[in-house]
Amino acid sequence: MKKYFLFILTTLSLTACYTTKNLPEDEVLYRGIKKLDYDAQLKRDSIQGQGVITALADAYNTVEGLLTGDANALKTEEADKGLIKDSLKKADKQDALNYETAKEEIKAALAYSPNGAIMGSSYYTHPFPVRLWIYNKYVNSTTNFGRWMMNHFAATPVFVSSVNPKVRSTVAHNTLRNYGYFRNKVTYDTIPMSNPRKAKISYHVKPGPVFHLDTIKYLPFYPQADSIIKATMNQSLLKQGKPFNVQDLDAERKRLQKEFRNNGYFYYRPEYISFRADTVMIPQKVQIQVRPLPETPAQAKHPYYIGNTRINIYKYNKFQLTDSITFRGQTYAYSNTEDRPPLRLRAILPNLFLKKGDLYQQTNQDVTQQKLADMDIFSSMRVSFVQRDSTLNNDTLDVVISGMLDKPYDAEFIGKITNKSNNYVGPGISFGMRKRNAFRGAETLGLNVWGSYEWQTGAHVEGRNSLINSYEYGATASLSYPKLMMFGLEKKRWRRLISSTNFQLDAKWVNRANYFGRVSFGASINYTLQKGKNIKHEFSPFSLSYDLLLNSTERFDSIITANPALYISMRDQFVPSMEYTFTWTKEKEKHLQTLKVNLKEAGNVTSGIYAICGQGFKKPEKELFGVPFAQFVKLSAQYTHRFTLTPRSCIGTRLFAGVVYSYGNASTAPYNDLFSIGGANSIRAFSIRSIGPGSYHPERSSYSYIDQTGDFKLEANLEYRFPIIANLYGAAFVDAGNVWLIKENSNQPGGQLKMSEFGKTIALGTGVGLRYDLDFLVLRFDLGIGIHAPYDTGKTGYYNMTSFGKSLGYHFAIGYPF
C-alpha cells in the first residue's frame, strides 16, 4: 500500500512540474480562485431605518393624544410601532435581495476558469490537465506530428496576467456602486502555490453600507408630459426607502418613454431623460431628480398621428415587388409569380391596429408587430414609420409594413429507442411536414406519420410470435389559423389578443403481441386565447374519438373479464367530449406562481339529445351509431409556486388535485382519462403506476400496472434547488400523494377513498437529485427514497419499506418535474 501511495505522489509531482515546463519566463500559471470573502453589514442601523417613520409616528401620537386622551394615544402608539416594525422587516428583505443580486454579478465579474477546470468552475480543477501537458510537450515542436497535436489537442495556458485581477476588481467595484454600495472596496491577493510558477487569486469584497432613495423629485418637462407623469406617478419604479439601483433608474426611463409614446410622442427616447443624484446631503441617502435632457430635439416634444399604410409582401427569396392594389386607402404591393397575391389581404388586415387619423401609440405598434409575428409565415417582418416631411408643422406618420414570406415547407425526422419496464424494447420513427400559408390565408397545414415496433427481451419471452409483431403506427393531420375561426361568433375586442384555431384529425393502430389489436380515430377543434401575459384560455368545443378493438387473445380476454373497469376502458366506444383549460401565471419579484384548471366532459351533450328524444339522461347503454359512448365529468387543478431565495437557488412547490366522475352511460371513464401516480415527474420514490388506488397492491406482472389508476388524485411536492459547481445544481425533495376510487370495486380491495384510512394511504417519498443546465436544456437525475408505502408491506410502523435498497427509485429525465 505504501508503494502505491509513493508512486501516486511521485506521478503528481512530475505532472505538476510538466504543466509549467515551457511557460514564458515572466508568466505565472493561473490555477483558479482560492477564496472570495465578503465583509457585509446587511441590517440597517436603527437610526437609519426608523428615521423619518419614527418622527412622523411620534408627531402623530402627540396630536392624537391631545385630542382623545392618553389611553387612545397608547393604542395608536402600539399600532404605529407594529407598522414601523413591518416596514423595517420589508426594507431588510429588499436590502437582502439587492445584496444577493449584486453578489451574483460580482461572482460573474470575478469568475475565470483555469486550465483543467471541473465543469467550468473557477475554484476546482482536476489533477490531470492533459491538454496543458500537451501544450508544454509540443509548444516548441517543429515536427508535423507536434504541430498537429498542438492544433488539435493542446490548451493555451491561462496566466494570471491574462486574468487581470486588477481590472476585474475594478469591475466588481463599479458593480457594487450600481447597486448603491458607494463606499465599497474590492481588493485581491495573488497566492503563490508550492510551485512558484503557479498561483491562485483571493478576492476581498467590503461592500460598506447601502444607500437608499430618499426624496424623488420630477422636474418640469413640458405641460402635456408633466400631466402624463403626474397621472402615472403611482407606477413609478423609484420608491422612497428602496436601495439605490441603476437598473431601477434605467427601467424608470423606459417606463416614461413608453407612457410618452403611448400619447403620440413617437420620437421620444429614454436618453432624453436624465437623473441627478445627491449622496452628500443626508448620510447614506440618495436624493434623486428626474429631469429632461436640455438638448431634447423639438420633434420629441410633439405628438404625431397615423397616416397612410403601405404593405409590402415579398415571396420567399424574391426581392422585387411587381404588382400592387389599393384597398380603403391602403396600398398592398407584392411579388407576383402566379397572377395572384401570395397572401390574401384579408389575412393581414385584421392584424393591423394602426388606423389612419389615430394618435400614434406604442401599444398599438407592439400589438401589430406581435400579431404579424404570430402568423408564423414570415421569415422577417418590419413595421416602420415615415414622417410626411421633416417640418414641425407636419404631424403625420405613414406606416410601412414589410414582410418576407418564410420557406413554404418544413420537415422533421425523429428516431427513438423504447425500453419499457415490461422488458419490451424497440425502435420508433416519426416524420412530420408543415406547409405554411397553405391556402394564402396564413393557415398552416401539418401532417405527421409515425410508427414503432417492439420485441420482448429476457429469459421468459411471452410466446413464439412476439419477436417483432408488437407494433403501432399512426398519422395526424392538422390545419391551424393564427386567429379565432368561430364562424361569426367571435368578439371584436378579441382581435387584439393572441389567438389560434386548430382543426385536427388523427388515427392510430396498435398491436400488442399475444394480447390485442386496436384502432383509434379522432377529430377535434381547439381554440387558444392569450389575454395579456398572465391569462390563457384553451377551449375545445368538439372532440370525438372512436376506439375499436379489432382482435384479442384468450389471455387478454381473461384479464378484462377479471377487471370490468379495464373492459369498459378497452371496449369499442365513442368519446364525444368538450374541454376547457384556464391558465394563470403571476411573476412578481421573487415569486412565480401558476394555476392551471382543466374541465372536461364527455357524452353529456349526446345524452341530452337522447333525453330530448324521450330517453333518460342517465339511462345506461345508450349508443352512438350503434356503439356505446363514454359519459363522465373530469375536473383537475394544479398550482405551482417557485420562491427565489438567491439568483441561483429557489424552493419549488406543487399541489395537484383531480377527480373524474362517471355516470349514466358508463360506470368507468376511459383508461386515458383516469389518474395515475408515480414516476420521474410525480412521486419519485415509486415508479409510474406502481401505487394505488388506495392501499390496493396487485401481484407484479407485465400488465399489472393497468389496474393502478383511480378516479381521484391528490399530490403535493416540495423541492429545494441549489447550485453546486458552475452549471451543476443539486436538489432535495419530498413527494406525497396517491390515487383512489370513488366507488368501491371488489377487484381492487382497499382502493376506495375513505377518510378513516386517508392518512395511511398517502405514499411518501424523499430524495436528492442533480440538474445540469445547458441553457437550452436541463438534464436531470433523481434518486427517490421511499418513506411510506400506502399498501401492506408486511412491516409495521409508518416507515414500512421492506429494505432500503428496494425503496430507491432512479430517474433520468429532461427538464424540471414542475
Language-model-detected regions and their locations in the chain:
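C-terminal outer-membrane beta-barrel translocator/porin domains of Gram-negative envelope proteins
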Residues: A333-Y334, T418-N422, E538-F722, F733-M755
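Membrane-embedded beta-strand positions of outer-membrane beta-barrel proteins
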Residues: F413, L445-V449, F503-L505, L595-L599, ...
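C-terminal beta-signal and terminal closure region of outer-membrane beta-barrel proteins
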Residues: I677-A680, A685, S746-F818
